[in-house]
Structure formats: structure tokens, C-alpha cells
From Swiss-Prot:
CDD domains: ASKHA_NBD_ANMK. InterPro entries: Anhydro_N_Ac-Mur_kinase, ATPase_NBD. The gene is anmK. Pathway: Amino-sugar metabolism; 1,6-anhydro-N-acetylmuramate degradation; Cell wall biogenesis; peptidoglycan recycling. Its EC number is 2.7.1.170. It comes from Escherichia coli O6:H1 (strain CFT073 / ATCC 700928 / UPEC). This is Anhydro-N-acetylmuramic acid kinase. It is an enzyme of class 2 (transferase). GO terms for molecular function: ATP binding; kinase activity; phosphotransferase activity, alcohol group as acceptor.
């Protein structure tokens, strides 16, 4: 069974940077050693946003974007190796999620698409890469997401305490770690995605630092109620979503009925939308004693305060409190999934994704001996 140093690479729907994590992994433990966040050039970020919102592009443009993202991921890995004074031979493999540009797990031909050419990563780092983690689960009738609940269960489940892990990235997803029950998990809806999109369009800022804009505004209740009527929120699990659904166009369609509103009030309303949709799903799933939050949203003081207020009797904390950096959780999970793939172990949970069976995930891109 492969064990040793693994690297996880994650570029999520928030597009706030490439997260790279170095960890030692074996069948008994996962020990994080180092991490860094690598910037995404504005031009690449905009290209990804455009494709996620349905903008047409040529096959040549698509191929170039795939290559450019692969090179970006390789640069991020090499930066971490240099920082840690490590060589390619010191790493067993890289687990690279890729950049999701479309996720449509239902319909006549369900599919999901993550780009960032793994061949570029192998060629530029000299390290074996495991990627394309989601499509095997979809081929077996699953949603292909979320995949991180299996990792949450391995690291954070408790024999007696009802726990849930909440990742607030661009999309928010919940892992249900309830003693005596199968692991559950699904996307609750927008996390930071709509908040980030709004402040970017209105103020040219990548995100609402410390929720300053949202805290300066007031929740527009009719707008909130209008958005809460979206059918996704009442759809039963298993379910997953992404930027191709909850994007700026989605927000604009709701704002048409509310002309002339204060932009800060919209920001406050979007923060409340995220908090309410998450808390409702926690309660619908039977509640928990401890909600451990990770992802960029765990740094949003307004979101954390609203979750605590909406979930009385639940201890709302970050995963940092149990020794796992909330910023690195997903990248660490894909390092772990790469280890499982190389070990021939399943990486999905049918109770989460709805797949017909457990399966080994991903494709292996071997480095030269």
C-alpha cells in the first residue's frame, strides 16, 4: 500500500486561489506538513467565469484554457516544493481536483467537467498525478459530488457526538457524521459565490473582507424570500450544484423585481441567504451537537455569527479548533483521495452521492521512472 508524502491541489468554485497542501498519508493517519495559496491571474479567472456562465468559446480557446490551468497548478506545486526544499522523488503523487467549469449530474447524459491538463502537471513537476476524480461516480449513477464527506468521516467522526462538517467555498456543502447512521452529505446551495460575484461587480473587490459591506447593509426580506423559493433548496438529497446554476445571472433575475436597492443591502441579503439555507438543511437533517466549518466562509464573521444564532444549542466552530486548517481542508482531501486511488481503495460514498456502488476514483497520470 502506497504511503508517504502526497500533495493535494484544489481550485474551487470561489476562484480565490489555488490551494496546495503537503501531507504524510498512510492507512493510520493524515498529517499535514505545509501549505500555500497560489494566485490565479485575473485573465484566467475571468475566462473560467465566462465559461461557467455559458459564454461560447472555440475549441482552441477551450484547449488553451485547459493547458494554462495545468501549467498554473504545476507552478503552484513547484513553489511548494521549493519552499520545503523537496524534490520530485520525495513525493508519491499529486491529487489534483482540477477547475470545475460545468457540473450537470442529472438529465439524459449526466456529466461533470474539471479542466487543468494533468499531463502538463506531470511534465512540469516530474510527479505522478491522480485526477479526474468525479466522473466515475457519475458513470455509476451518482452526483459525482460531494466527495469530501468520506474524508471528513475518516478524520472527524466521533463515536457518540452528532457532528456535521460544513465547507463554505463558492458552494456550501454539508457532511453528516451521525453515530449509527450512514455518512450523508450534499451541496446546500451558494456559499461565497453570489456574495463574491456581487461585490466584484459593484466595488471591484474579490470578496467582502470581514463582511464589512454586508454588515453595513440590511437584509431585504422580500428579496430573500424570493430567492428561497428556488426549487434547488427544497430538492431532496443526493444533490449537488455549482456556478453553472448559482451565478450572477441567477442573481440578476431575482434583482429585476427590486430596482434601485442599496448594493450593501443586497450584500447583506446574500449573506443571509447562505446562512439560512445552510441552517435549514442542518435542522432538516436532524441537527447536530457540533458544526465544524471550513473553507473561505469560515473567515466571514457575519456568516459565523448568523449560523450560531440560527442554530441554538449547536456548537458552531471552525475545523481549526480540531487541528485542521479550514483553508486547506479540500486540498488535503484530494491528497487523501489520491492515496486511496493508488492503494486501490474506493473514494466515494454511495450514501452521499447516490452512486450504485463504491468505486476507486480518478485516473492516474504516471511520471517517468
Amino acid at each position: 500500500m502506497k504511503s508517504g508524502r502526497f500533495i493535494g491541489v484544489m481550485s474551487g468554485t470561489s476562484l480565490d486561489g489555488v490551494d496546495v497542501v503537503l501531507a504524510t498519508i498512510d492507512e493510520h493517519r493524515v498529517a499535514q506538513l505545509a501549505s500555500l495559496s497560489w494566485p490565479i491571474p485575473v485573465s484566467l479567472k475571468q475566462a473560467v467565469l465566462d465559461i461557467c456562465q455559458g459564454q461560447q468559446l472555440t475549441l482552441s480557446q477551450f484547449g488553451q484554457l485547459d493547458t494554462q490551468l495545468g501549467r498554473l497548478f504545476a507552478d503552484a506545486v513547484n513553489a511548494l516544493l521549493k519552499e520545503q526544499n523537496l524534490q520530485a522523488r520525495d513525493i508519491v503523487a499529486i491529487g489534483c481536483h482540477g477547475q470545475t467549469v460545468w457540473h450537470e449530474p442529472t438529465g439524459v447524459a449526466p456529466h461533470t467537467l474539471q479542466i487543468g491538463d494533468n499531463n502538463q502537471i506531470v511534465a512540469r513537476t516530474g510527479i505522478t498525478v491522480v485526477g479526474d476524480f468525479r466522473r466515475r461516480d457519475i458513470a455509476l449513477g451518482g452526483q459525482g459530488a460531494p466527495l469530501v464527506p468520506a474524508f471528513h468521516h475518516a478524520l472527524l467522526a466521533h463515536p457518540t457526538e452528532r457532528r456535521m462538517v460544513l465547507n463554505i467555498g463558492g458552494i456550501a456543502n454539508l457532511s453528516l457524521l451521525i453515530p449509527g447512521q450512514p455518512v450523508g452529505g450534499y451541496d446546500t446551495g451558494p456559499g461565497n459565490m453570489l456574495m463574491d460575484a456581487w461585490i466584484w461587480r459593484q466595488a471591484g473587490k474579490p470578496y467582502d473582507k470581514d463582511a464589512e459591506w454586508a454588515r453595513a447593509g440590511k437584509v431585504i426580506l422580500p428579496l430573500l424570500q424570493n430567492m428561497l423559493c428556488d426549487p434547488y433548496f427544497s430538492q431532496p438529497a443526493p444533490k449537488s450544484t455549482g456556478r453553472e446554476y448559482f451565478n450572477y445571472g441567477w442573481l440578476e433575475r431575482h434583482l429585476r423585481h427590486f430596482p434601485g436597492v442599496d448594493p450593501r443591502d443586497v450584500q447583506a441579503t446574500l449573506a443571509e441567504l447562505t446562512a439560512v439555507t445552510i441552517s435549514e438543511q442542518v435542522l432538516l437533517s436532524g441537527g447536530c451537537e457540533r458544526l465544524m466549518v471550513c473553507g473561505g466562509g469560515s473567515r466571514n464573521p457575519l456568516l459565523m455569527a448568523r449560523l450560531a444564532a440560527l442554530l441554538p444549542g449547536t456548537e458552531v466552530t471552525t475545523t481549526d479548533a480540531v487541528g485542521i486548517s479550514g483553508d486547506d481542508m479540500e486540498a488535503l482531501a484530494f491528497a487523501w483521495l489520491a492515496w486511496r486511488t493508488l492503494a486501490g481503495l474506493p473514494g466515494n460514498l454511495p450514501s452521499v452521492t447516490g452512486a450504485s456502488q463504491e468505486t476507486v476514483l480518478g485516473a492516474i497520470f504516471p511520471a517517468n521512472p
